[in-house]
């Protein structure tokens, strides 16, 4: 064992796998820390700051290890996934974790901490009074046209529960707050780039604590998390766009109101100072990890006193709130009896910046400014149907998608929380449409694209020439090990241009797109014009020990060809806009080659099955996976496959893979199928990751492909079920990364992976606008396209759809029998065309074109195809619908409990199979 140890940390589920719990040396070779744990199962590892192979420890290379109180457990070096140390306290309390190094061996032991001792104070306890505060409460905004008023909308989407549930908010800077209701132990932490300073908080009414464990209920609101008591309530709000949190308490009657925040600030290692309206805690730079704020300014919206206290004065801070004896214990009291008391905590890297944030918070009534900006966000892309449950789920999916937008390393979208708190190229651009574009956040979308484009590999001698990073973990650490991240970005460039009409950006981004195409032609193009790649370089990228792929999909996967095809389509449009005739002509020829050869190589005419990939030796792999659906949904212009083949693709995939709770990553009839993802003794979790496990984001293109071919009612059943996941399971208000394929209880699904995943919620939100409403703006051609695929249960709705420079299309709909009534009103000043495609029940569809000016109405008989409208310059065209009877009749499949997957009967079956084959190493 190396004698010079780095600082080691306990990283686990209780601290977001962060640097909250460093181990301190207490004796030679012995290191310990004290943590507060609730009576749940907690998973963790012992690791250095970067989780290096040499300094990452658990109890077993593959399996989980259950720790027993007061018993030493041997440690081994391992970086695996799913092989954590597990500990489940019988009751909430503080626990000492001791790691001991002896020679070449290491052990860990957990014991109940005997005392929560406060150290001898090395400075005086502060008492500071703020006698006057200039505070003007902000008034609610006027209702937005076509939308519910703010209080009505917030009340409709509020989620109330009387039992504990987890939740998460993001600050859109570099931090997020994960919490749990009805508890004080591990009840929440506001995590910055590294570490945390603010945990949970307690509110007091006339000196009596509001006990969260006994709250009547907890309410997840669009703007915060509220606990309700008999005659009062308290609320946590994380402010969007800055490092600020607001802790609030409300009382039905004027009372003395107080707040105590849980602060992870050691009393003896902090300096304290005052300013006009509050106090500032300052930490030594040596104690602040890179990117973490060093100063915390605290203020309130009413006259108040700030008192640093001890456990002897307030024992409930130890017994009920579970504060650490080492840390500051700050009471903030209102000077007068009040019905509302807001406390702001503002985090910054300089004291002056922290104070400035605090003063601004009071002057602007920041908590309500934040609240009403959320209202305007929700109204910017608005859909309100007669299905209230679906409305709520869509609103929460949109809100949840904002959790991941950040500016940690420039504008980006984190992939997932807690352990994918990085900007992944693939994930970012799959999520961009449902996070930014549908919500009218066009400048944000442009900033994210520009940021990734600036990191494009421009070294012509590199194998990654033309690629943007797959993963950005810092401004100097970028990984380019993906073949699809850049094509997804180029696809979103085209979506951005069509939503915004930004022709200037079409010129700016063209060299980036051209460089990518050149890079593919130089290194990755086969004789058929198809794009080649390594086995693990698709989204199914899990590898054994970081070397051999669990789900090999080289060297030509079907989704990669669809993305390559879409990239060429986008490049051709950009070449035309930039008057690059030679490039346009060359790429058009290549595009046609891809289209014809893709069908001949991938489509089996005899079996009517699309290959998942073509191997390097030319063999087709006909594994039934959901990827085939992307060959239909990825292209934004002319389709890659004919409608006849497309309907077969949908039928094949959905009939084999779609359960009521999501679409499997591999058919249950496949030999490699794994029915469960995590916590299995028979196999490593990564063997199941893409071999059966359900991915939330795959539901997005499943809904799109079903709606494309007339399966919108089954798609909507899936959306409804996913909506229940968002509003009632796991971390409430968001979606997890994964689910087990086989589920025994629809009402209590087994989730896995990250507790919140960007593309899961963004795809759910995207489906509402782009698929059910069928809104596809085409501003490059001065046209708005609507091709609604409305579920039959929708009888009426209102919608606001953003496009251009702050413009909206307001839409209302009602249905009476076969008669559909549409009303359109656009806000743009310039003339624009409307293209409306309406599906008839007779197998045809009517395309309506006209000038979008003022308010226009359309009446449509879906049975007869009769249409009435007051559209100017009306043109109509009748076409054959691509709706498929076979798709419209599809139903969910179910787990086949009669089969016993090989993965369950033969331990490590897939790992042994792969290691016995001659797979090429793919080390990044």
Model regions and ranges:
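Extended glycan-interaction surfaces of carbohydrate-active proteins
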Residues: 347-351, 380-423, 447-481, 522-556, ...
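Intrinsically disordered, low-complexity polar regions and short flexible loop motifs
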Residues: 4, 50, 61-112
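Terminal accessory carbohydrate-recognition/targeting modules of carbohydrate-active enzymes
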Residues: 109-384, 441, 711, 723, ...
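Aromatic (Trp/Tyr) and acidic
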Residues: 142-191, 322, 551-554, 620-659, ...
């Amino acid at each position: 064992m190396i004698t010079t140890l780095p600082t080691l940390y306990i990283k686990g589920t209780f601290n977001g796998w962060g640097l909250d719990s460093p181990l301190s040396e207490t004796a030679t070779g012995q290191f310990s820390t004290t943590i507060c744990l609730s009576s749940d199962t907690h998973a963790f590892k012992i690791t250095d700051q970067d989780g290096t192979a040499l300094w990452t420890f658990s109890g077993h290379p593959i399996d989980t290890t259950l720790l027993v109180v007061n018993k030493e457990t041997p440690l081994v070096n391992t970086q695996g996934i799913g092989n954590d140390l597990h500990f489940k306290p019988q009751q909430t309390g503080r626990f000492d974790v001791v790691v001991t190094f002896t020679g070449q061996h290491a052990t860990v032991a957990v014991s109940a901490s005997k005392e929560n001792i406060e150290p001898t104070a090395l400075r005086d306890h502060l008492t500071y009074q703020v006698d006057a505060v200039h505070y003007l409460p902000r008034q609610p905004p006027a209702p937005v046209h076509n939308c519910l008023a703010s209080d009505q909308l917030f009340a409709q989407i509020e989620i109330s529960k009387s039992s504990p549930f987890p939740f998460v908010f993001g600050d859109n800077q570099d931090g997020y707050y994960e919490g749990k209701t009805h508890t004080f132990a591990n009840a929440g932490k506001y995590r910055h780039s590294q570490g945390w300073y603010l945990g949970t908080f307690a509110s007091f009414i006339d000196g009596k604590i509001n006990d969260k464990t006994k709250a009547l209920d907890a309410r997840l609101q669009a703007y915060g998390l509220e606990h309700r008591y008999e005659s009062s309530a308290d609320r946590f709000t994380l402010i969007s766009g800055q490092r600020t949190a607001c802790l609030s308490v409300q009382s039905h009657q004027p009372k003395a109101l107080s707040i105590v925040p849980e602060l992870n600030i050691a009393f003896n290692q902090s300096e304290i100072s005052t300013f006009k309206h509050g106090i500032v805690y300052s930490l030594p730079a040596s104690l602040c990890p890179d990117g973490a704020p060093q100063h915390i300014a605290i203020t309130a919206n009413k006259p108040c006193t700030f008192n640093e206290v001890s456990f002897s004065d307030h024992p409930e801070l130890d017994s009920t709130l579970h504060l650490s004896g080492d840390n500051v214990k700050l009471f903030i009291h209102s000077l007068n009896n009040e019905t509302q008391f807001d406390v702001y905590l503002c985090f910054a890297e300089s004291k002056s910046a922290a104070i400035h944030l605090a003063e601004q918070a009071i002057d602007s009534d920041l908590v309500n400014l934040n609240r009403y900006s959320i209202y305007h966000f929700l109204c910017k892309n608005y859909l309100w149907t007669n299905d209230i449950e679906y409305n709520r789920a869509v609103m929460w999916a949109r809100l949840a998608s904002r959790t991941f937008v950040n500016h940690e390393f420039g504008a980006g979208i984190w992939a997932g929380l807690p352990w994918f708190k990085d900007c992944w190229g693939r994930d970012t651009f799959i999520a961009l449409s449902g996070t930014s574009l549908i919500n009218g956040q066009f400048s944000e979308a442009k900033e994210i694209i520009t940021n990734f484009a600036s990191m494009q590999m421009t070294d012509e001698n590199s194998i990654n020439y033309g690629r943007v990073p797959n993963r950005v973990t810092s401004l100097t650490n970028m990984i380019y090990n993906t073949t699809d991240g850049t094509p997804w970005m180029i696809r979103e460039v085209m979506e951005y241009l069509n939503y915004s009409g930004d022709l200037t950006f079409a010129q700016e981004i063209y060299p980036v797109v051209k460089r990518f195409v050149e890079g593919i032609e130089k290194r990755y193009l086969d004789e058929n014009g198809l794009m080649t790649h390594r086995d693990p370089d698709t989204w199914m990228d899990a590898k054994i020990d970081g070397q051999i792929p669990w789900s090999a999909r080289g060297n030509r996967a079907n989704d990669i060809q669809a993305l390559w095809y879409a990239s060429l389509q986008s490049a051709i449009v950009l070449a035309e806009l930039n008057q690059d005739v030679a490039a346009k002509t060359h790429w058009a020829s290549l595009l046609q080659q891809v289209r014809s050869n893709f069908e001949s190589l991938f489509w089996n005419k005899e079996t009517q099955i699309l290959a998942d990939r073509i191997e390097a030796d030319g063999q087709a792999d006909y594994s039934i996976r959901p990827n085939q659906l992307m060959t239909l949904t990825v292209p934004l212009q002319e389709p890659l496959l004919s409608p006849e083949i497309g309907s077969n693709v949908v039928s094949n995939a959905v009939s084999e893979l779609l359960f009521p709770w999501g679409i499997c990553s591999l058919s249950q009839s496949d030999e490699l199928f794994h029915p469960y993802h995590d916590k299995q003794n028979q196999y490593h979790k990564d063997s199941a990751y893409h071999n059966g496990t359900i991915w939330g984001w795959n539901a997005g293109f499943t809904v799109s492909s079903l709606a494309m071919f007339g399966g919108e009612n089954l798609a909507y059943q899936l959306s409804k079920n996913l909506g229940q996941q968002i509003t009632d399971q796991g971390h409430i208000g968001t979606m997890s990364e994964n689910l087990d394929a086989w589920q025994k209880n629809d009402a209590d699904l087994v989730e896995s992976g990250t507790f919140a995943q960007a593309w899961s919620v963004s795809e759910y939100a995207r489906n509402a606008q782009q698929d059910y409403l069928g809104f596809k703006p085409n501003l490059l051609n001065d046209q708005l396209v609507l091709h609604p695929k409305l579920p039959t249960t929708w009888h009426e709705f209102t919608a606001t759809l953003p496009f251009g420079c702050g413009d909206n299309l307001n839409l209302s709909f009602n249905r009476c029998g076969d008669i559909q009534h549409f009303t359109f009103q656009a806000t743009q000043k310039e003339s624009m065309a409307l293209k409306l495609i309406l599906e008839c029940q007779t197998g045809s569809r009517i395309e309506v074109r006209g000038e979008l000016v003022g308010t226009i109405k359309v009446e449509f008989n879906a049975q007869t195809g009769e249409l009435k409208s007051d559209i100017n310059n009306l043109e109509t065209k009748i076409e054959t619908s691509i709706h498929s009877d076979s798709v419209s009749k599809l139903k969910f499949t179910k787990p086949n409990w009669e089969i016993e997957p090989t993965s369950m009967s033969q331990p490590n079956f897939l790992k042994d199979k792969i290691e016995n084959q001659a797979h090429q190493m793919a080390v990044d």
